[in-house]
């Protein structure tokens, strides 16, 4: 009978590492927490970026509106400048001094018209104030009439009050303002703009005609204005 001997060396049992169930569960929990943390961080980051984007857009929008407002103001200033330059050029084209140098009658009529306009402006302003306070304007009219007569203005006396024959608005203002209004009608929409350009027209006209009074017995427009203003102040100061 044959005896069989088995060698233990050929039948070794390999030891296998077995991870406990509890340890695997812990790893899954940690992984889930890590994923959740990343997700939360991403959401927070997205929220911050969104807030920054909105803030930037608001700032950009505000800056755009501010820039547009500034640009609008600049355009208004430039347009006013253009209108005034046009008025000045129109006045130069009238060539008041040139025409006056060629025609003594024209020069005399121009001086009378300018001083008569100064008379009318001062008279209207003071009379309006005196009447509003219930003051009799007859003495005032008599005194400024005498001042106008002394200045060399032609006119007529009625009810003991002298009135210049050329009393009225400055004859050069209307054509100057009208030409600018026709050229730039959008700049004469409101009364404030109209008044502003009228004041400017009067200013440049007075500067233009000033040389006509250099060699003349008549007072300059500025001197005549001061004479009438002093008379007006005397009556205004006595009002209650």
Swiss-Prot record:
Entries under Gene3D superfamilies matching the protein: SopE-like, GEF domain
Keyword Chaperone attributed: no
Other known facts: Encoded within a lambda-like prophage region with similarity to GIFSY phages.
InterPro entries: SopE, SopE-like_GEF_dom_sf, SopE_GEF_dom, SopE_N_dom
Segment forming the signal sequence: none
Family matches, as Pfam families: SecIII_SopE_N, SopE_GEF
Name of the molecule in the record: Guanine nucleotide exchange factor SopE
One GO CC term on file: extracellular region
Gene Ontology molecular function terms on file: GTPase activator activity; guanyl-nucleotide exchange factor activity
Native organism: Salmonella houtenae
Protein role: Activator for both CDC42 and RAC1 by directly engaging these Rho GTPases and acting as potent guanine nucleotide exchange factor (GEF). This activation results in actin cytoskeleton rearrangements and stimulates membrane ruffling, promoting bacterial entry into non-phagocytic cells.
Keyword Secreted: yes
């Amino acid at each position: 009978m044959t005896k069989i001997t088995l060698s233990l060396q050929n039948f070794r049992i390999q030891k296998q590492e077995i991870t406990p169930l509890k340890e695997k569960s812990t790893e899954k929990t940690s992984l889930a927490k890590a994923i959740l943390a990343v997700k939360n961080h991403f959401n927070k980051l997205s929220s911050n970026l969104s807030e920054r984007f909105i803030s930037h857009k608001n700032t950009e929008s505000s800056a755009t509106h501010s820039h547009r407002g500034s640009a609008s103001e600049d355009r208004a200033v430039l347009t006013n400048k253009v209108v005034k330059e046009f008025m000045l050029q129109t006045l130069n084209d009238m060539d008041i001094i040139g025409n006056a140098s060629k025609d003594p009658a024209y020069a005399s009529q121009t001086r009378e018209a300018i001083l008569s306009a100064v008379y009318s402006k001062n008279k209207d302003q003071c009379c309006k104030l005196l009447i509003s306070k219930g003051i009799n304007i007859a003495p005032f009219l008599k005194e400024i009439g005498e001042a106008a007569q002394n200045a060399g203005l032609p006119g007529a006396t009625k009810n003991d009050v002298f009135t210049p024959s050329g009393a009225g608005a400055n004859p050069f203002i209307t054509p100057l303002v009208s030409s600018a209004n026709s050229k730039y009608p959008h700049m004469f929409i409101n009364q404030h703009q109209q008044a502003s350009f009228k004041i400017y027209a009067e200013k440049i006209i007075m500067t233009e005609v000033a040389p006509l009074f250099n060699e003349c017995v008549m007072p300059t427009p500025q001197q005549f204005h001061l004479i009438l203003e002093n008379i007006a102040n005397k009556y205004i100061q006595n009002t209650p």
